[in-house]
């Protein structure tokens, strides 16, 4: 499938987002773009998301890639709002392209049995399934109320069941300095999956020489034409690629 796409010189990949865990939205995106001719989709590494993509395909053939990342990689981060610092200005809500922020000040039941409420004070994602970690909310918050957390998935728990579902590619987002974690996860992926793999990295945290050295080490024992390398800058922001 991928070889055919590349030979046609018309290979378009729709990145639904490693952080996009909204199954309904993913199904709609895949249905729309596959109807328009797209045959390559990048998905969050969750069984329900792969299932949603397959429903969206409605029997059409396509190349499905799931994305995982190292701790701190922007692809797998989620925005959090600190209830103590948030002033409820709604700037983050207005700029969020995913509509992942509905209320800046969250009211939660601290003691449901007593029907008591209190403003949450611990940073946590809002509508986390929709947050893709683009950072636009962070850029407009003047009260330092927004931070990020990285979702650290257990690959041994997640990937085997996705492989059983018949995925076509696994992508490792390795935009960070921790070589130990990068190669630990990369070696595990190579151990359990012998198909197409993709490496996504950038110079944001590495020098150009270090980035090239890492990529060469990662592909050294890979078979020819079974590895995709992307060095495409910061993800999902829709802004300038630096």
Predicted regions located by residue number:
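A short, Lys/Arg-enriched amphipathic alpha-helix followed by its capping loop at the start of a domain
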Residues: 32-38
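N-terminal amphipathic alpha-helix/helix-capping segment at the start of soluble metabolic enzymes
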Residues: 1-17
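Iron-sulfur cluster-binding cysteine motifs and their immediate structural context
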Residues: 91-126, 136-152
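Conserved mixed alpha/beta catalytic, RNA-binding, or beta-rich assembly cores of soluble enzyme
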Residues: 18-21, 25-27, 38-39, 45, ...
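Alpha-helix-loop-beta-strand connector modules within alpha/beta enzyme cores
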Residues: 47-70, 186-199
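N-terminal active-site wall of soluble small-molecule enzyme domains
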Residues: 4-6, 25-27, 52, 56, ...
């Amino acid at each position: 499938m991928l070889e055919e796409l590349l030979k046609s010189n018309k290979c378009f990949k729709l990145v639904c987002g490693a952080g996009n865990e909204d199954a309904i939205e993913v199904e709609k995106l895949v249905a729309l773009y596959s109807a328009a001719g797209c045959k390559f989709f990048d998905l969050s590494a969750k069984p329900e998301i792969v299932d949603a993509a397959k429903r969206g395909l409605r029997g059409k053939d396509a190349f499905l890639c799931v994305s995982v990342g190292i701790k701190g990689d922007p692809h797998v981060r989620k925005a959090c709002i600190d209830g103590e610092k948030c002033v409820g200005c709604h700037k983050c809500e207005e700029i969020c392209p995913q509509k992942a922020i509905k209320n800046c000040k969250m009211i939660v039941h601290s003691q449901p049995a007593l029907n008591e409420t209190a403003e949450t004070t611990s940073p946590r994602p809002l509508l986390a399934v929709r947050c893709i970690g683009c950072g636009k909310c962070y850029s407009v918050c003047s009260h330092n109320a927004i931070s990020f957390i990285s979702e650290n998935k257990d690959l041994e728990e997640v990937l085997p069941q996705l492989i059983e579902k018949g995925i076509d590619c696994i992508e490792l987002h390795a935009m960070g300095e921790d070589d130990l974690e990068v190669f630990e996860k990369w070696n595990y992926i190579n151990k359990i999956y012998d198909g197409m793999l993709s490496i996504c990295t950038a110079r944001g945290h590495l020098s150009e020489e270090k980035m090239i050295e890492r990529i060469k080490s990662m592909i050294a024992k890979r078979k020819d034409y079974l590895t995709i390398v992307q060095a495409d800058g910061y993800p999902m922001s829709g802004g300038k690629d630096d």
